[in-house]
Design a protein with these regions (language model features):
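Extracytoplasmic ligand-binding site segments that recognize negatively charged/polar headgroups
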Residues: 1-126
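A ligand-binding cleft/hinge motif common to bilobed small-molecule-binding domains
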Residues: 4-8, 128-146
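Short beta-strand->loop
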Residues: 16-23, 36-39, 61, 129, ...
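Periplasmic-binding protein-like
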Residues: 28-29, 43-44, 70-78, 102-105, 111-112, 181-205, ...
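A bilobed periplasmic-binding-protein/Venus flytrap-type ligand-binding module shared by bacterial periplasmic
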Residues: 46-53, 88, 160-171, 190-191
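Short amphipathic alpha-helical coupling segments at ligand-binding clamshell hinges
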Residues: 59, 100, 161, 170-182, ...
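An extracytoplasmic/periplasmic, membrane-proximal ligand-sensing/linker region
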Residues: 99, 199-242
Length: 242
């Protein structure tokens, strides 16, 4: 589940708050300030680049330049929760907004069913650039795919795959213990060992993480994303189709 799903469950009054959860050291914005759900990891979205590409973008805005025309694939938010959060995050920014997506459409970018389809398109050279989640790009690169990954200058939207406790939980104490483990250094090191960026930086980065790289996360107002999601998906479908 993603934070948007958790926000909807919270709105419906189905989540049990866990005020004592240890959130010190967690990435800002990775957990609900009312302590009803907590991010287990960070999965960021950036730009995958085929190593044979002639140009290398440094920012999201670069993708709207003429040299990238017809060479971009991205996951459709109609099928990808991470893409829906990306859309809801980017369209609220003054430096990107809907203008960015309109520019992508004018540049003949295509929206495909999900991140897997984006990865395949970039890896096989069908497209030179793809909007893609981090670990998929780096895992493919480690297996020999001709892919690099760019952390765009404006920042990266992220999903957090939160953990939460339902009010109907039959064993709330065990549920709290599970949350404690997920948020602990040991739990976060487990996420890192599985190839994900931990929500707690002290747990250490996954093996694929570039030495010296710094990730700037785009702030996301999840409640606003949920509220605007239906309208956003409708507008996106009008631009890129279903």
């Amino acid at each position: 589940a993603d934070a948007a799903t958790m926000e909807a469950l919270k709105k419906d009054g189905r989540l049990l708050a866990y005020r004592e959860a240890k959130v010190d050291g967690l990435a800002p914005g990775s957990y609900d300030t009312d302590h009803t759900y907590f991010g287990s990891k960070l999965i960021t979205t950036g730009i995958a680049v085929n190593t044979a590409a002639k140009s290398r973008p440094a920012s999201w805005a670069d993708l709207a330049k003429p040299e990238y025309k017809g060479q971009i694939a991205m996951p459709s938010p109609l099928y990808s929760g991470a893409a829906a959060i990306m859309l809801g995050t980017m369209t609220t920014r003054s430096d990107l907004g809907w203008k960015f997506f309109e520019q992508l459409k004018a540049s003949d970018a295509v929206a495909v069913r999900g991140n897997g389809a984006v990865l395949n398109a970039v890896a096989n050279g069908e497209k030179s650039y793809g909007v893609l989640v981090d670990f998929m790009a780096f895992n493919a690169k480690a297996k020999g795919s001709p892919i690099d990954f760019v952390f765009p200058a404006e920042g990266l939207p992220a999903v957090t795959e939160p953990v939460a406790i339902l009010k109907t939980a039959q064993n709330p104490a065990a549920a709290r213990a599970f949350v404690d483990f997920i948020l602990s250094d040991d739990g976060q090191k487990l996420a890192s060992s599985m190839g994900y960026i931990p929500a707690r930086a002290s747990a250490g980065m996954p093996s694929w993480y570039p030495a010296g790289a710094k990730i700037h996360l785009m702030p996301t107002n999840i409640a606003q994303v949920v509220q605007s999601n239906a309208a956003n998906l409708k507008r996106f479908a009008e631009l890129f189709g279903n």
